[in-house]
């Protein structure tokens, strides 16, 4: 039932996506119906059944004499004209039997005598061997470009394989020269045994040209000569032949239409096939692995996609097939319906099969394009005859081939006028491949593709799949070739340990609760840092739902040890935090726990179930929120939750309640029916958290759940996690240390794949902490450096060992050691006295006079106290681990130097190279920025042009898959077509020789029409030969029965009648079926054999051999067929070349690297012109290769100039259109698919539709012209393909000048050029600022309904600095400030996102812009960086309007980097665009400053998130500008790397003339970097000032933490605190059994730090607790209050700045 529920859910999901993806629905359903609809309508309308004319043929004679040469007959070329009226011809001959040479010479002498007259002299010439004869014949053939004559001197050659007069045996072959215009069909039996005639009006068949080539007359002459040699005196009789009459056949447009079904439905289903391939590949990339962890069945995943795609096909089927069933004859509707539906199902399964190989949509689309085209080509090229049953079975393994065979079987029944239905579909299966067998093969295809898709998916989803895993399903035990992070004993699991793990595993399986008593030691942490693991007896006995034992994960592709012997336990009721630097192995650990990847070694149990052995059971208990957002853009919030809820198998009746509770908790309930694509980044993360929690998952894995969220949103999620953890086990990773501190009941710290520390926050801080942090804000009027020195002296006077920390603008930090805590109160009293300017206070009595005299110059505005954070602890632990690993590494290297046989191994993720950053490199960067770029004007434009060319070249070189499909595949496809013209057959090639024996026309019926007792001897012998052969069925008829009646009675019979014999006016006539290609020469040999009296063992057999000028004798395919293939192949080839151009444009734009380039000041004209020129050069190079191929294959040799013109026109008409429409798409793969559909599918369908309409129906010429003109204008591929067909058709008879006439190719060229001009004009128009501004306004109005902002608090104190800032902006000169924003307003419809914003940022200032999601930050940044236009107001950078082409340094929220460039290349390209002369040195300097030298030459796609952010920061610092804008510059970076970025930005602020403006969701970052901070709410500025000023003005509480000695103290301490501090609020929940209790104490106006700290100190001493903490409101709390999200209003958890506890 659970599988069926999954299937229904997935089907529902696909249905919802179908309804909302209107563009795809248009292409998948409406366009095929529009293409097929008119055709079906015309077919049905013209479905009147008519009868073809009855054909009765006259007889003719083959005499084997000169009379045959000059015989004239209607509609057939006489022999002598083929010989160009030559009077002397030669026939060469040779005998393979030397003993029969004299006999052969005599026979050929008689042969020559038969062809002597006044008009013709035929001579014979003997050659020594067959090879010699062939050489002579080939050399004698005329050159095709010299004459149209088929021969020179030699008319033919004869090879006698056996001549035995005694035994009456003759076996020979006639050798004929092949001409291009002649078609012999040597590999085929008949062209169409049944149905209406194709119009044979001649009594003598013209194809194959047995008569015209003189084959028949030479054959009869040779055999008659042999008869005279065997039977002297035998009469020389002619053979009278007559074609069997052809009866009237019923005909209609339906039968003709059905013949084209394989091509029509291949085009129609192509869109469905592409779409299912794209959708599955897209989901394989992100969503499917996530849903699999939630319990998704792979089979149901593919089944749902296939069923939905099939249902879409079914809609098209209903529109196109059902109407045909009402006008069809002979074939039951059920048979046709089942056939087409089976094909549709097989086609979509083929798309799913191809998609199973990929998790990248671009590669999948290219693969399906080639694969589907190949399947169609194979089905067209290699189709066997229906009577070749074994070949048909092999051919039917291709779904298109099986469908073609089924259609051919249906057409066969319709032509035979026999009833076909599902009950008789296997009839005549022994004679030909029936419809039944075709359907069986389609079922086989469906099965093998379905199984193949599941197998390939299983292999691909084994994330670390290698060939070794096919044969080794156990974890490797030999680690000698594995990189080692620390020591061998930590990761090499010996047999004793392995057995112990197995025993404990058995215990868990027998008793799941036994897992709670297992406590694996944290050997890793203790082995690196002594005492880094806290011992907690209560936790050891708690129930652990997650147990990880000795987890090892080694990526076989790189050898990197991602996780190295990790062991941990996460217990129920707690939120366990997993911390680590980027690349430490956190995500790999999560994926292993969730069962997404398979560990190399170790064991993981979830709720007592083994992840490796019982994945189904474990997935029922897991809820996961990965780092990325596994969301469907077109599903709403509630629909995502419904999908995940159902996959988890939870009770459906509880869904609504569960969903509403979770959405309400994270403040997302108002977005319940909003699509995911319209959600902000923070909202998407909230949704992912809810997806992890819904369905009562017992184990919840949250991988950076709050990444990208603003503090308010983070608080919502934290509150939810705190509430939900009571009955769950939550394991969470984060880079926000304050979040880890707030949520973490237990903290695990990883480094280099190992667990290096674990314990509570308090334990880790106590073990690795540094002290308290005193933050003082100095007044702007004084000398801040002098005041900083005085302040430091004051602090060291009262608190020994106090140290000066960092200084941010007017804000200075002082580090106070924890051990000196008792000295804090006097220090606070002194600072309060200084702030009040009370210099006579008693607190200064012991202060030295020199220092006391300077107190008046120390002007303080405010101060506050916080404690060292968990972030500082994390950095300290990381430094200690690095030192420990380096020490062990050095020790190992020393050991290896003594034992060279052991290789030196390097831990994954560990870099022993020291940091290259230094003050010297920072200063060099500042000096470079001060000098500015050296190039300007034309020189800068040239540099920009070169950089774009380099960028595109690097992209092309790295994208081998794209280059392969864009360049190599088109060349290969064209080469394959060309190779068909060069493939030749040798002497034994089956395509050049055919044996003309009776078996070639078996099985067959024979019309035997004689009166009883009047059968001549010759006919009697002929009948004996037939019966001896066994493959003929003789049907006896009376001569009174007319032949037309006989053939009419045989309509549809199998096998058909091919030969016969009758008496007509006392003359014996041989009858033959005109539709069988090789029946005439076969029949003549059989008759001459019958004339040999005395024995039926006589044998006469002939054969035909075709030779050509070359030694390989003949082409495999005629040139006409090559010409037919060339046009559609060129359409496909040029579509593949040009449509791929769009992918780079969209990828560059969507990743915002294009925007980064525009921020260098480059003109859009320069930018796109360079890109267009590069694409033109690449296109030209490809066309040059095509030109060489055209020359090599002699295609359109005389009209190559016209061909090249159309190549140019195709580029000119299609590429500007591709550039213009690229702005409509966000997905490169979707754009590529739609363009391929436009260029190939729709154009091909248009070609096919026009062909069918013109061939089947009669419509007015003016309507034809309009239809063709519309297609040619809107479809350049159609015009191009039509021109190629015209050149192929008329190129041999018309000169180039006439080919370019309007009626031939001129119209195509003009319409393609017109479309190109229109497309280019549209593209240029889109580059104008006024057009983009207009489109932006239209777009913003459209999006206005998606905005929502929290209400603003009404009780906040007014910040006077806001009005002061407005006044300053209106009076300041914009050129004197780095940035001036004056009355900036941006409206979206009725919603105002930015409301008259006024700001001024000075040089050397770091300005922070804060606000919740929707407050206007992103909109402001978009206006400043030119991504959108303001509705009113202005913004000036360095005195210039931001809408101008100016240089801006910008680090966006999401890394604007091209994945296929290296970090170095990205910086070099942008530096060159900025105009730096030595751009490589500039990029090197940036890499030095951001610490990325070691990774500079790695592709961006292989960077971690932190490494990408470093490069993005480097890109911002690269710009020679007065303004650097940073949007969350350290998001996703681990704390250590974050501090390094801060250091660089601080240096930049202090030592350059540039100003910094940033926004961040990390309040620590804002405090560390910003000299001023502004807060936005509802688009308006509500507060501005330094961080301490904002905290002092808006901070409204303190946080007190008391640490207990034992749990039984809790109730007593809580009660006493409530008594002593009645206004305090306990924030530690009763379900949390921690010994650290937190209270929130409201801040009052009269509070001062000295009194408050002294009071808490006394309270802690009276209560007898172990430790205490008192801290002020954090900046985050202040921000939340300003945003209306503080705890007093929202009842959320405290967010205070604490980290360390001190002893009483």
Curated annotation (Swiss-Prot):
GO cellular component: intracellular membrane-bounded organelle; plasma membrane
InterPro entries membership: AAA+_ATPase (IPR003593), ABC2_TM (IPR013525), ABC_transporter-like_ATP-bd (IPR003439), ABC_transporter-like_CS (IPR017871), ABCA (IPR026082), P-loop_NTPase (IPR027417)
Polar residues bias locations: 512-525, 888-902, 911-921
Top-level division of the source organism's lineage: Eukaryota
Parts of the chain that traverse the membrane: 23-43, 256-276, 306-326, 334-354, 362-382, 389-409, 436-456, 963-983, 1126-1146, 1153-1173, 1176-1196, 1201-1221, 1234-1254, 1266-1286, 1311-1331
Subcellular location: Membrane
A single GO BP: positive regulation of apoptotic process involved in development
Effect noted on mutating residue 639 to G: Cell corpses not engulfed
GO terms of molecular function: ABC-type transporter activity; ATP binding; ATP hydrolysis activity; ATPase-coupled transmembrane transporter activity; lipid transporter activity; transmembrane transporter activity
Major location (coarse): membrane
Keywords: ATP-binding, Glycoprotein, Membrane, Nucleotide-binding, Repeat, Transmembrane, Transmembrane helix, Transport
Residues bound to ATP 2: 1411-1418
Region (Disordered): 511-536, 888-933
Stated consequence of mutating residue 586 to R: Cell corpses not engulfed
SMART domains: AAA
Expression sites by tissue: Ubiquitous in embryos. Expressed in larval germline precursors. Expression in larvae and adults is seen in amphid sheath cells, pharyngeal-intestinal valve and phasmid sheath cells. Low levels of expression are also seen in gonadal sheath cells.
Keyword Membrane among record annotations: yes
Membrane topology of the entry: Multi-pass membrane protein
Domain comment (free text): Multifunctional polypeptide with two homologous halves, each containing a hydrophobic membrane-anchoring domain and an ATP binding cassette (ABC) domain.
Task performed by this protein: Functions in the engulfment of cell corpses during embryonic programmed cell death to translocate molecules that mediate homotypic adhesion between cell surfaces of the dying and engulfing cells.
PANTHER family per UniProt: ABC TRANSPORTER CED-7, ATP-BINDING CASSETTE TRANSPORTER SUBFAMILY A ABCA
Record family assignment: Belongs to the ABC transporter superfamily. ABCA family.
Protein's name in the database: ABC transporter ced-7
Originating organism: Caenorhabditis elegans
Gene this protein is translated from: ced-7
């Amino acid at each position: 039932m659970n599988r069926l529920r999954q299937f229904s859910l997935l089907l529902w999901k696909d249905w919802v996506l179908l309804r909302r993806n209107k563009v795809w629905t248009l292409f998948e359903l409406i366009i095929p119906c529009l293409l097929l609809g008119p055709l079906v309508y015309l077919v049905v309308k013209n479905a009147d059944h008519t009868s073809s004319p009855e054909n009765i043929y006259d007889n003719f004679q083959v005499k084997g004499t000169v009379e045959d040469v000059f015989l004239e007959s209607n509609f057939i070329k006489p022999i002598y004209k083929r010989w160009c009226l030559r009077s002397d011809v030669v026939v060469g001959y040779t005998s393979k039997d030397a003993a029969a040479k004299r006999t052969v010479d005599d026979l050929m002498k008689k042969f020559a005598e038969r062809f002597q007259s006044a008009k013709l002299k035929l001579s014979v010439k003997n050659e020594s061997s067959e090879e010699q004869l062939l050489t002579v014949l080939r050399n004698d053939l005329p050159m095709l470009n010299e004459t149209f004559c088929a021969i020179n001197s030699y008319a033919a050659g004869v090879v006698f394989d056996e001549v035995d007069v005694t035994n009456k045996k003759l076996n020979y072959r006639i050798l004929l020269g092949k001409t291009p215009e002649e078609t012999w069909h040597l590999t085929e039996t008949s062209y169409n045994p049944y149905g209406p005639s194709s119009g044979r009006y001649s009594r003598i068949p013209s194809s194959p040209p047995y008569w015209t080539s003189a084959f028949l007359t030479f054959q009869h002459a040779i055999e008659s000569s042999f008869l005279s040699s065997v039977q002297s005196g035998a009469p020389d009789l002619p053979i009278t032949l007559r074609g069997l009459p052809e009866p009237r056949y019923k005909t209609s447009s339906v039968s003709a239409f059905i013949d084209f079904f394989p091509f029509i439905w291949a085009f129609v289903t192509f869109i469905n096939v592409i779409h299912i391939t794209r959708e599955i590949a897209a989901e394989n990339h992100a969503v499917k692995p996530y849903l699999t962890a939630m319990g998704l069945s792979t089979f149901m995943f593919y089944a749902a996609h296939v069923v939905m795609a099939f249902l879409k096909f079914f809609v098209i089927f209903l529109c196109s097939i059902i109407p045909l069933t009402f006008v069809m004859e002979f074939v039951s509707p059920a048979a046709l319906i089942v056939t087409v539906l089976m094909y549709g199902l097989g086609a979509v399964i083929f798309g799913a099969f191809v998609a199973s190989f990929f998790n990248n949509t671009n590669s999948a689309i290219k693969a399906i394009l080639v694969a589907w085209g190949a399947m169609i080509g194979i089905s067209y090229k290699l189709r066997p005859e229906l009577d070749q049953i074994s070949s048909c079975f092999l051919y039917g393994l291709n779904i298109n081939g099986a469908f073609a065979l089924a259609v051919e079987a249906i057409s066969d029944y319709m032509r035979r006028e026999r009833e076909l239905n599902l009950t008789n579909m296997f009839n005549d299966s022994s004679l030909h491949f029936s419809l039944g067998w075709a359907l069986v093969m389609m079922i086989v295809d469906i099965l093998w593709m379905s199984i193949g898709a599941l197998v390939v998916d299983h292999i691909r989803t084994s994330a670390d799949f290698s060939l070794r895993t096919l044969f080794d399903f156990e974890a490797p035990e030999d680690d000698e070739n594995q990189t080692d992070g620390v020591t061998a004993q930590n990761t090499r699991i010996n047999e004793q340990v392995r057995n112990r793990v197995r025993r404990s595993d058995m215990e868990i399986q027998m008793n799941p609760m036994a897992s709670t008593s297992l406590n694996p030691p944290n050997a890793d942490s203790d082995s690196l840092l002594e005492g880094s693991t806290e011992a907690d007896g209560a936790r050891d006995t708690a129930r652990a739902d997650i147990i990880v034992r000795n987890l090892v994960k080694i990526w076989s592709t790189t050898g990197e040890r991602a996780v190295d012997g990790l062991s941990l336990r996460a217990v129920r009721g707690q939120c366990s935090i997993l911390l680590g630097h980027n690349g430490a192995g956190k995500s790999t650990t999560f994926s292993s726990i969730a069962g997404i990847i398979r560990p190399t070694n170790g064991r993981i149990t979830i709720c007592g179930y083994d992840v490796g052995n019982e994945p189904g059971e474990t997935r029922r208990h897991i809820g996961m929120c990965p780092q990325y957002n596994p969301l469907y853009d077109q599903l709403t919030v509630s629909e995502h939750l419904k999908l995940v809820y159902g996959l988890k198998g939870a009770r459906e009746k509880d869904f609504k309640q569960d969903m509403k509770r979770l959405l309400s908790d994270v403040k997302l309930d108002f977005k319940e029916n909003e699509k995911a694509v319209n959600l902000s980044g923070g909202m998407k993360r909230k949704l992912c958290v809810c997806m992890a929690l819904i369905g009562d998952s017992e184990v919840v894995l949250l991988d950076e759940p709050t990444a990208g969220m603003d503090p308010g949103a983070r608080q919502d999620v934290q509150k939810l996690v705190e509430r939900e953890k009571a009955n769950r086990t939550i394991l969470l990773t984060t880079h926000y240390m304050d979040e880890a501190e707030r949520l973490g009941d237990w903290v695990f710290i990883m480094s280099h794949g190992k667990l290096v520390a674990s314990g509570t926050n308090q334990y880790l801080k106590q073990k690795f902490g540094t002290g308290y942090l005193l933050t003082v804000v100095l007044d702007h009027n004084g000398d801040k450096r002098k005041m900083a020195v005085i302040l430091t002296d004051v602090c060291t006077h009262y608190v020994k060992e106090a140290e000066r920390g960092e200084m941010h603008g007017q804000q200075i930090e002082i580090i106070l050691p924890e051990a000196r805590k008792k000295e804090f109160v006097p220090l606070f009293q002194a600072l309060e006295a200084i702030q009040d300017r009370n210099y006579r206070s008693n607190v200064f009595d012991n202060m030295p006079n020199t220092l006391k005299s300077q107190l008046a110059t120390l002007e303080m505005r405010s101060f506050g106290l916080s404690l060292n954070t968990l972030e500082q602890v994390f950095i300290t632990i990381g430094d200690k681990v690095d030192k420990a690993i380096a020490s062990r590494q050095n020790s190992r290297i020393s050991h290896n130097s003594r034992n060279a046989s052991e290789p030196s191994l390097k831990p994954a993720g560990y870099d022993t190279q020291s940091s290259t950053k230094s003050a010297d490199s920072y200063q060099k960067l500042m000096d470079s920025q001060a000098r500015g770029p050296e190039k300007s004007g034309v020189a800068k434009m040239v540099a920009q042009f070169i950089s774009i060319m380099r960028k595109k070249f690097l992209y092309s070189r790295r994208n081998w898959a794209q280059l392969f499909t864009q360049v190599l595949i088109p060349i290969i496809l064209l080469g394959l077509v060309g190779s068909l013209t060069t493939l030749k057959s040798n002497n034994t090639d089956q395509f050049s020789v055919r044996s003309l024996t009776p078996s070639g026309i078996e099985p067959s019926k024979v019309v035997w029409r004689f009166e009883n007792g009047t059968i001549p001897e010759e006919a009697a012998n002929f009948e004996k030969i037939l019966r001896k052969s066994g493959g003929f069925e003789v049907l006896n008829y009376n001569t009174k029965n007319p032949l037309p009646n006989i053939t009419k009675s045989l309509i549809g019979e199998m096998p058909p009648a091919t030969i016969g014999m009758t008496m007509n006016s006392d003359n014996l006539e041989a009858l033959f079926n005109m539709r069988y290609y090789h029946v005439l020469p076969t029949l003549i040999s059989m008759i001459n054999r019958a004339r040999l009296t005395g024995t039926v063992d006589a044998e006469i057999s002939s054969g035909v051999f075709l030779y050509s000028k070359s030694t390989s004798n003949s082409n495999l395919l005629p040139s006409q067929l090559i010409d037919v293939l060339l046009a559609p192949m060129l359409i496909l080839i040029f579509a593949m070349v040009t449509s791929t151009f769009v992918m780079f444009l969209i990828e560059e734009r969507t990743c915002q690297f294009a925007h980064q380039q525009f921020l260098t000041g480059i003109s859009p004209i320069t930018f796109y012109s360079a890109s267009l020129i590069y694409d033109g050069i690449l296109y030209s190079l490809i066309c040059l290769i095509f030109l060489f191929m055209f020359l090599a294959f002699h295609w359109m040799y005389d009209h190559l100039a016209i061909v090249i013109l159309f190549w140019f026109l195709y580029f000119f008409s299609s590429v500007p259109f591709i550039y213009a429409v690229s702005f409509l798409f966000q997905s490169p793969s979707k754009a590529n698919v739609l363009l391929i559909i436009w260029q190939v599918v729709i154009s091909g369908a248009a070609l096919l539709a026009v062909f069918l309409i013109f061939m089947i129906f009669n419509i007015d010429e003016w309507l034809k012209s309009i239809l063709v003109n519309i297609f040619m204008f809107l479809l350049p591929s159609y015009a191009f393909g039509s021109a190629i067909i015209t050149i192929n058709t008329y190129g041999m008879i018309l000169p180039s000048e006439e080919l370019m006439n309007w009626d031939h190719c001129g119209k195509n060229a003009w319409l393609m050029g017109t479309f190109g001009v229109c497309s280019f004009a549209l593209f240029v128009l889109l580059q104008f600022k006024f057009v983009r501004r207009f489109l932006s306004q239209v777009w913003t109005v459209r999006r206005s309904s998606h905005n929502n902002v929290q209400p603003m608090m009404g009780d906040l104190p007014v910040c006077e600095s806001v009005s002061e800032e407005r006044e300053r902006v209106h009076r300041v000169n914009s050129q004197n400030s780095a940035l001036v924003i004056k009355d900036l307003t941006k409206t979206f419809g009725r919603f105002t996102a930015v409301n008259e914003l006024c700001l001024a940022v000075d040089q050397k200032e770091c300005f922070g812009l804060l606000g919740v999601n929707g407050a206007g930050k992103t909109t402001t940044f978009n206006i400043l960086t030119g991504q959108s236009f303001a509705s009113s107001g202005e913004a000036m950078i360095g005195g210039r309007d931001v809408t101008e082409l100016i240089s801006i340094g910008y680090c966006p929220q999401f890394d604007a980097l091209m994945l296929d460039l290296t970090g170095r290349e990205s910086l070099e390209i942008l530096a060159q665009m900025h105009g730096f002369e030595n751009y490589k040195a500039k990029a090197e300097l940036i890499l030095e400053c951001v610490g990325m030298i070691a990774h500079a030459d790695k592709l961006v796609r292989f960077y971690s998130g932190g490494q990408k952010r470093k490069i993005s920061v480097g890109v911002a610092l690269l710009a020679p500008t007065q303004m650097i804008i940073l949007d969350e510059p350290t998001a996703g970076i681990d704390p250590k790397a974050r501090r390094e970025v801060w250091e660089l930005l601080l240096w930049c602020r202090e030592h350059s003339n540039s100003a910094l403006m940033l926004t961040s969701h990390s309040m620590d970052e804002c405090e560390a970097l910003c000299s001023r901070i502004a807060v936005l709410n509802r688009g308006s500025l509500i507060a501005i000032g330094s961080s301490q000023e904002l905290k002092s003005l808006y901070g409204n509480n303190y946080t007190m933490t008391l640490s207990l000695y034992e749990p039984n103290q809790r109730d007593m301490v809580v009660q006493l605190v409530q008594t002593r501090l009645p206004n305090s609020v306990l924030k530690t929940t009763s379900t949390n059994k921690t010994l650290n209790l937190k209270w929130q104490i409201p801040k009052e106006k009269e509070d001062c730090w000295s009194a408050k700290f002294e009071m808490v100190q006394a309270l802690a001493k009276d209560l007898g607790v172990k430790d205490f903490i008192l801290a002020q409101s954090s900046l985050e709390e202040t921000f939340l209050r300003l945003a209306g999200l503080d705890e007093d209003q929202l009842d959320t958890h405290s967010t205070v700045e604490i980290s360390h506890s001190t002893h009483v």
